[in-house]
């Protein structure tokens, strides 16, 4: 039990600690399981429509196998040789919903050939590029690589961090998820549905 508390304390300290801008993060983040926290600069809070909560992460998540693949590749599209995949990233969908008007983003079906599950909306390629550029300009990352002797599941540890930090963009398990984010994501899902219906006419 004492070791478990130590892991919880260590994770919280790491997620409050050193952060790397998205573009620099690949040189510092290990390819291992662990937790990550996404932070923003002061201007980004205003872009997203929230009052600034300095030193509070916007989002906390986990990777069961590879922080680089889950965090940097999927959410932040740091590998420019691969297209961004908002349809596969709840983090990108949340940022897209809140930045829809500012970045002129349009939601589309994740799989245009077989549209459905519109809550998992994607963006047009041009919109994905604008979202990625904004994320690279404003966001930074802190990580906690999981140790080999971890005696608590990452899922439980993630839950403990969500309760401790209460990040705005986590819609489950955080004590106070943002109603405005939920509403904004519903707008995007409806737009993706309408886009698919128009394409099928």
Residue ranges of predicted features:
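GIY-YIG nuclease catalytic motif and its immediate N-terminal context
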Residues: 1-130, 139-201
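PLD/PLD-like phosphodiesterase catalytic module centered on the HKD motif
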Residues: 135
């Amino acid at each position: 039990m004492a070791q478990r508390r130590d892991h919880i304390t260590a994770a919280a300290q790491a997620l409050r600690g050193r952060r790397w801008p998205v573009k620099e993060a690949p040189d510092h983040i290990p390819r291992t399981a662990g937790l990550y926290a996404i932070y923003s600069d002061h201007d980004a809070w205003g872009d997203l429509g929230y009052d600034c909560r300095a030193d509070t992460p916007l989002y906390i998540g986990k990777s069961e196998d590879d922080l680089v693949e889950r965090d940097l590749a999927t959410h932040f599209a740091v590998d420019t040789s691969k297209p961004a995949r908002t349809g596969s990233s709840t983090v990108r969908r949340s940022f897209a919903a809140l930045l829809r008007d500012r970045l002129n983003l349009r939601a589309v079906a994740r799989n245009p050939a077989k549209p459905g599950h519109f809550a998992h909306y994607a963006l047009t390629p041009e919109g994905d590029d604008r979202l990625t550029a904004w994320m690279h300009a404003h966001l930074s990352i802190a990580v906690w690589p999981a140790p080999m002797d971890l005696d608590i599941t990452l899922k439980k540890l993630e839950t403990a961090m969500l309760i401790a930090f209460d990040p705005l963009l986590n819609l489950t398990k955080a004590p106070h998820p943002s109603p405005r984010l939920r509403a904004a994501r519903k707008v995007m899902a409806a737009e993706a549905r309408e886009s698919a219906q128009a394409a099928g006419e």
